[in-house]
A protein has these predicted regions:
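Transmembrane alpha-helices and adjacent helix-loop boundaries
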Residues: 1-133
Length: 133
């Protein structure tokens, strides 16, 4: 067995151990960041003055700080919880800010006539968002 064969075996073993954890991390972060983005983006598109400013600050801060710094901050400050869930929390918060801006942009791109049509039909806000927008 050559050195190259040993290296290939070691790399395959490491990939076999790390790949399931990576896929779990991706799935959990995607789920939570989508949830954060949809909820906060919908709230932000309603343009409630104080809430809009707070969420705008959240978006600016989370998009301005590198993800690795957020990971290190949460890892150093949160002593309870596993490394996996600390990683999920920090990545989801950062990516949730990006998703929030995407959802907000989607709401703002809807034509004003569609909002007025829903208002003329006297649809509740949730029905307007689900069925019209």
């Amino acid at each position: 067995m050559t050195m190259q064969d040993r290296y290939i075996i070691v790399v395959k073993t490491m990939l076999g151990q790390g790949m399931p954890m990576t896929l779990k991390l991706i799935g959990a972060c995607l789920l939570f960041s989508l949830l954060i983005g949809i909820v906060f983006g919908t709230i932000r598109s309603l343009k409630i003055p104080v809430v809009d400013q707070i969420l705008g600050l959240y978006a600016v801060v989370c998009r301005g700080i590198p993800t690795i710094i957020v990971l290190l901050f949460f890892y150093a400050t949160l002593v309870r919880g596993t490394q996996f869930w600390i990683s999920v929390l920090s990545i989801s918060l950062v990516e949730g800010a990006y998703m929030m801006e995407i959802v907000k942009g989607g709401f703002l791109s809807v034509d004003k006539g569609q909002w007025e049509a829903a208002k003329a039909l006297n649809l509740p806000l949730i029905h307007t968002i689900v069925y019209i927008v």
